Amino acid sequence: TEPNAGSDASKSQTEARLEGDHYVINGAKIFITNGPEAGVFVIFAMTDKSKGTKGLSAFIIESSFPGFSVGKVENKMGLHGVHTSEIVFTDMIVPKENLLGQEGKGFKICMQTLDVGRIGIAAQALGIAEGAMKEAVEYTKTRVQFGKPISKFQNTQFTFADMALRC
């Protein structure tokens, strides 16, 4: 994710230019899971902006590379055991052999990676929804209104039936 591109990989502003036996990369990525702790990253950068998505390339980088830095660490509402941060590349030197695949093939790699990630996020969301529904059902068994648990009211049962269909 980039500050001005969101999750639209085709709008990547990070640039990489080949200079002899290395690439020089400039740009930033945001919302990087374990950004302050990780030592190795796969990033995507434009090697030829004139080609649009066919100019996006993938690189394996290390936090020890000259020009790499960790930017702002996010103050999140949850998941405090996993830090999320910005990572910044200022004339970062990346060896030529750290190009992942071929120049211009990064968009395909990126899309394949995002597809797998999206499946995981969907599974996580479904698990959260199922857990929330379970908690709600238990609550309706103990919440008494008009002399009986609200789980006995037909409207509450219809609501849960609709929720179950959506999970």
List PLM regions with ranges.
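Beta-hairpin (beta-strand-turn-beta-strand) motif
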Residues: T1-P3, M46
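Glycine-rich phosphate/pyrophosphate-binding beta-alpha loops
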Residues: P3-S7, I30-P36, L79, V116-G120
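Structural signature of FAD isoalloxazine-binding scaffolds in flavoprotein oxidoreductases
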Residues: D8-K11, E62, V88, V94
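Short glycine/proline-enriched turns and hinge-like loops at secondary-structure junctions
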Residues: D8-S10, N34-G39, G52-G55, H80-V82, ...
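A structural signal for short hydrophobic beta-strand segments in well-ordered beta-sheet cores
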Residues: T14-R17
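A short core secondary-structure module
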Residues: H22, N26-V70
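Glycine-rich beta->alpha junctions and the first turn(s) of the following alpha-helix
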Residues: F68-C167
